[in-house]
Amino acid sequence: MLQPLSHLPAFSLVEPLLQAIVNQNMIIGAPPGAGKSTVLPLSLLNTHIKGKILLMQPRRVVVRNLAQYMAGVLGEQVGDTVGYRIRGENKVSASTRLEIITEGILSRMIQSDPELAGVAVIIFDEFHERSIHSDFGLALALEVQAGLRDDLRLMIMSATLDTAPIASLLAQHSPVPTAQLASEGRSFPVTVNYTKEVLAHEVIPHCVEVIMNAVTNHQGDILVFLSGAGAIHAVASRLSAHQQQNDYIIHTLYGAMGKQAQQAAIAPDPQGQRKVILATNIAETSLTIEGVKVVIDSLWENSAEFHPSSGLTQLTQTRISKASAIQRTGRAGRVSEGVCYRLSAKESFERFAEHSAPQILREDVAPLLLETLNWGTHFSNLAMLTQPSKAQSAIAIKALEEIGAVNKKGDFTAYGRSLAQIPCHPQLAHLLLFAKQNVSAVAQFSDAQKCAIKTAAPFIVALAQAQLQSEHVLISDALLHFTPAQRNDITKQAKRYAQFVGLSEQALDLSALDDEALGLCIAIAFPRQLAFKTSASYKLAGGKGADISLANPPQWIAVLQGQHIGNSVKIRLAQPIAEAHLKALYPNQFTSSPKVQFNKESQVMEARKVTSFYAIELASSPLSKSERADDPQFYLQETASAWLRYLDALPLKQWPLSQANWRWWYRVKLAAQLNLPQPQAYDTPDPWPTSLSELLTQARDQLAQSLGTCKNLQSLHGLGWQKILTSALSWPQQDALSQSLPDSVVIPTGRKVSLDFRENGDVVLSVKMQELYGLSSPYVVADGKVKITYELLSPAGRPLQTTKDIVGFWQGSYKEVQKEMKGRYPKHFWPDDPANATPTTKTKKAMDRQAAK
């Protein structure tokens, strides 16, 4: 069965794999081209393993292509022994034993059947990509293996995987031991060329230039890696314009394309014509594209990035990692020696990250949290290779609470369990259930409006997931201008969700959608993405500012897609909505309450009555003295809170701290660096604050008490900041600071001089040189751990010398200073033996007069 694949390097792993997997989990490391994704899964079919084999792949196009290829190796059709299952599409039968699935499918299979009855092996392919679904799927599979199925075998395969972390994870959480195997890749030498440094907006013209040169100077098909569909179509358009003759054919390859177009890009051209394939990173790994001898790598990719401040997830163009670049380069060496052009200077490439950050740290984890709660646990209890941050978890819990998936205590609700049964983002699932069950309870909506919402909801879900780009900002306009293929795709996706709103697929008609209902559906799913026109711009309900390119922007608009640019959001796809409809949907979010706010123009804190919708201020009016007198304590607290918000928005360097305050902080910072002992501590000493933000957090209560009476910016600057800062330290810390890091020393003249504690950790004594005569041993602080730096000044107060070794200075370079200063300041005392001379602040005449008395 595997004879046609025996030339592939991964074939050498078949025998040890079949021996080991009987009693062990497996970790397989093999570079691109080794054949691990085909040889090893197929090898498991002709063994004692009787159950089904699940092969997880991160991309739909790879799933289809692998299924087609492996079925062909067996001489069968897809759906016989080898089948596949992706969202909304499957080709499996009762005889299917090797099922290739996209990653999100596995978690749903486990949720519906925790024992995974009939499944013998789960293979996690391309695990190095660290997708959120593969991490979660592995965590669930480990729980199944540990609790229910110790006969289940897990197999993790990757091209660039650092195996130590995953081996450690399996050792901790699996009841089954783990074996590791590695294979060489099937790769001919590839010559890597770097072009020049190009900015992001210069990539497309530069890429076209490099492609045209490659067409002229090299043989074979050309595979071009670009960030996304937009860049692909831009390059394709320019290439077509430059094409002099029909000597090559242009293909595009990205996830949202139809199956036939994807297959045409992958397969050899029927007429044998040379191909230029413009692809995203879906061509980076398991996809085999024969005939490629040239790779042109833009070194960019589009990755989903979640912005908590707006609730929006957008595709952001980012640099790939070195590991991804190496994968892409290998595509040029599959059939013969090849060449790769990287569109960057080599020096810049060397600064790229070694590996991409795990997807779980960049994306919205609310869907993952919903699945985790539905499983009956929480993130922290799962065997996740990377845990979401505490901030991510808190944001996700808040989002689920707002739609009723969890209660205020964070407990999973029956409604949350219903949401978890719908295969889309929780907020979109909430839209579907609301349209089916709850919209009827909104008395202000007519029956026609309720029906329109129910019909529009599946289309909004489809649009939100498709991330289609349009020149038109309004969804109603964009739908009219979508291509027939786009309209068909959106309708097809929408029909998948018809059942969840209680409609038949035939009831969904894209051309009959109600414009008003489109905005209402977005408002139901994403209330914090509602935007209110303030003046020339918008304010999102989540608090972020936003802009829109629209001739007549409406007062309210519901945002489906937006792009973060700087500190604002560019609205890309949205739909108008009436305020009356928002009041019907969210009556409790339209509030009127007294607030204290900082007026930037007058620089005064003002008490006002503010009407709001979430974080949007709709109207405000000043409160009279009599109104404020009703509850003075409330306004003291509100004033303090307003000042804290004002200060929190400032960089620390802009806080109203004096130079003396900063010197004191550098003193504390030095104490933290030295871990200065606290002799007066009764028990375990309090840790020293290691950052100013940490210290200010510890002083926040004292700060809040002081801020309540501040009326304007001038009074803020006049606060007793030193007392506030000092309150952050315990009494033993204050005592240790005073004793071991004093803020001044007494110099030989008897004068007390302040020490200057600096940001770099230096402690500087700045004093006129004559006042240190007679100093024969250096000053030290921190029990001798820190030497003082002496900034020795001239009689005019100008720096002459800086040293940490005052004794060495007297014995050495002082002679040169003495010689120069005698000529410049002849009236002052410049002794030959300063270490034993009398310190003074006087001229020689004054010294003589004093001696004569």
List the predicted regions and their residue ranges.
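P-loop NTPase motor module signature
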Residues: M1-L431, S440, F445, E505-A507, ...
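Active-site proximal loops enriched in glycine and acidic residues that flank catalytic Cys/His/Asp
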Residues: P32, Q57, I86, L226, ...
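Conserved helicase core region in the C-terminal RecA-like lobe
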Residues: G104, L278-I282, L299, F532-A536, ...
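Short conserved micro-motifs at the rims of enzyme active sites and ligand-binding pockets
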Residues: Q111-S112, E202-V203, H307, F352-H355, ...
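Acidic, serine/threonine- and proline-rich low-complexity intrinsically disordered segments
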Residues: S440-K539, K544, Q555-S744, K785-K853
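Amphipathic alpha-helical packing elements
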Residues: Y538-K539, G545-I548, P651, L737-M769
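Short, surface-exposed, low-complexity cationic segments
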Residues: L550-V569, F757-I788, L792
